């Protein structure tokens, strides 16, 4: 497991209504913790696929996804390892835009996200639609770095950050839930930071 700098300077900010329970403000830092080696993804060969229970399975290459209408997220992110980072800006494309192109079959209820490394995570469909999720390639106006999931990652900022799969390459829509990597290893199936859904059995 790789750990990088940023797990210092803890500010608990008691009473701050932007800080979920059990979290600390990481300030200017952005800690990283991964269960695998950081890949160097080539944008010339990278693709993003949305398939499964959709009307039109679609794959975009790097140029193709950049040609879609852009969208940005400004707000906070929260990691299950207890850090939170305020006032982040990510730029990319809304997942809603991708699903408008592919269509969604009525029986779809969940999404299984897969990274180029084989990492997986599961999400309810409701957690990536209606302006809640993005495919992003910029952070604060600069290309997303590999250790933070670059060149492109999933962003689901209202859930703990392991749900925002780094090095994303596929979203498969399904009619059932299936646990991903961390979920199979004891982490919560949904991961709402405001409910402290860190581990299996949490509310």
State what each model feature region is.
Residues 2-203:
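Structured, non-membrane catalytic/scaffold regions adjacent to prosthetic-group chemistry
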């Amino acid at each position: 497991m790789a750990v990088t700098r940023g797990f210092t300077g803890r500010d608990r900010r008691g009473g701050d209504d932007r800080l979920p329970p059990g979290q600390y403000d990481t300030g200017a830092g952005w800690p990283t913790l991964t269960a695998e080696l950081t890949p160097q993804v080539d944008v010339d060969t990278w693709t993003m696929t949305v398939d499964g229970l959709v009307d039109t399975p679609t794959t975009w290459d790097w140029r193709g996804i950049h040609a879609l209408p852009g969208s940005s997220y400004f707000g906070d992110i929260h990691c299950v390892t207890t850090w939170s980072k305020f006032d982040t800006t990510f730029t990319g494309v809304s997942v809603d835009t991708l699903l408008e192109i592919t269509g969604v079959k009525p029986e779809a209820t969940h999404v299984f996200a897969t990274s180029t490394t084989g990492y997986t995570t599961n999400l309810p469909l409701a957690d990536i639609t209606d302006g809640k999720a993005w495919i992003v390639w910029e952070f604060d106006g600069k290309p997303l770095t590999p250790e933070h999931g670059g060149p492109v990652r999933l962003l689901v900022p209202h859930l703990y950050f392991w749900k925002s799969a780094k090095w994303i390459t596929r979203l498969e829509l399904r009619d059932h839930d299936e646990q991903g990597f961390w979920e199979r290893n004891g982490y919560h199936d949904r991961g709402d930071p405001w409910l402290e859904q860190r581990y299996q059995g949490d509310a």
